[in-house]
Amino acid sequence: MSTTLDQYKQVVEFMEVCNQPVNTTRTFQTSKIANLRIELIKEEIFGTGELVDSINKDSKVGILDALCDILYVTYGAIATYGCIDALGEYEITINNENRKSQLLYKHNALTYVKELTDYFEQFKRGVEIGDSRTISDGLVRIVSSCVSFARVSGFDLAGAYDEVHRSNMSKFCKTEKDALDSIEFRLTEAETLPNPAKRVEQKDNYTGAYVEKSGSVYVIKRGKDGKGLKGKDFFEPDLSKYA
């Protein structure tokens, strides 16, 4: 059995390796951290290749991947703002024997997109007016909506999320040299990407990136906001068996 709290704890593990603050009591954030948390959720819902894009392309794997990513960054925001007290622990595992995945009709899928948009705006509004209750309500509702979307679609969200977590933990490098080499590798790789938007995004991410030691690993961080970036040994999650 896998629960929302189990998923939250996996994100906390990732954040602690990245030396990102994890708060267990309600905590407001400075503009830099607040803006990062807002942009991370916004990107996973509306960004290129993310949820809305995957719905429009009828991509079950893309939709599931986006739901996992939205959950990951939302749990991260819950940890950052210390809203763990508002996160209910409920089961996300479904019976694989009876599981049959399906693409939702567009109007049904867009109902979830509207929900997620409304809850994201609620979170954002809470950040802007400094209201902890509004922040936590928006975040936990995003979690609930993602879990519901996956369940109705017949996706194995528990298995997929574990795969995404393993993938995220592979971002880290074993030595400082590996991390520095990874920055150069990703900058060179960016020049070969066929998607112009992804090419620009990757170049922007790794230009000015820096390396930070955390315990026994080295973390590559984006220069403008400290977001953890992928090392050269990062592997993409294979979610096809869960979708």
Language model features: what each stretch is:
Residues 1-243:
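Flexible "arm" and connector segments at domain edges
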